[in-house]
């Protein structure tokens, strides 16, 4: 009887997690919007290139 109880509990947990994943409104086909084109890392790399960066591995 104990094994049946554990099996039922595991099934309930799996079903509830599957339902939570399906409830998320994210659309897989949606195009992501880039609010920060280039980003901070690209800006810092550009600054390093302009200043002739002495640290070759980090200059890109």
From Swiss-Prot:
Keyword Secreted: yes
Modified residues (Cysteine amide): 59
Secreted as UniProt keyword: yes
Biased amino acid composition, Basic and acidic residues: 25-35
Chief localization: secreted
Coiled-coil features, chain-numbered ranges: none
Disulfide pairings: 53-59
Endpoints of the signal sequence: 1-19
Region (Disordered) location: 25-45
Gene Ontology MF, one: ion channel inhibitor activity
Keywords tagged on the record: Amidation, D-amino acid, Disulfide bond, Ion channel impairing toxin, Neurotoxin, Secreted, Signal, Toxin
Location of D-tryptophan modifications: 55, 58
Residues making up the propeptide: 20-50
Gene Ontology cellular-component terms listed: extracellular region
Location in the cell: Secreted
Database matches in InterPro entries: Conotoxin, Contryphan_CS
Expressing tissues: Expressed by the venom duct.
Family according to the record: Belongs to the O2 superfamily. Contryphan family.
Entry comment, domain topic: The cysteine framework is C-C.
Function: Its target is unknown, but this toxin may modulate voltage-activated calcium channels (Cav) or calcium-dependent potassium channels (KCa).
Protein name: Contryphan-Lo2
Species this protein is from: Conus buxeus loroisii
Phylogenetic classification of the source organism: Eukaryota, Metazoa, Spiralia, Lophotrochozoa, Mollusca
């Amino acid at each position: 009887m104990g094994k049946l109880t554990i099996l039922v509990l595991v099934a309930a947990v799996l079903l509830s997690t599957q339902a939570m994943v399906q409830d998320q409104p994210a659309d897989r086909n949606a195009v992501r919007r880039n609010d920060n084109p280039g980003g901070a890392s690209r800006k810092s790399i550009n600054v390093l290139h302009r200043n002739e960066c002495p640290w070759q591995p980090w200059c890109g």
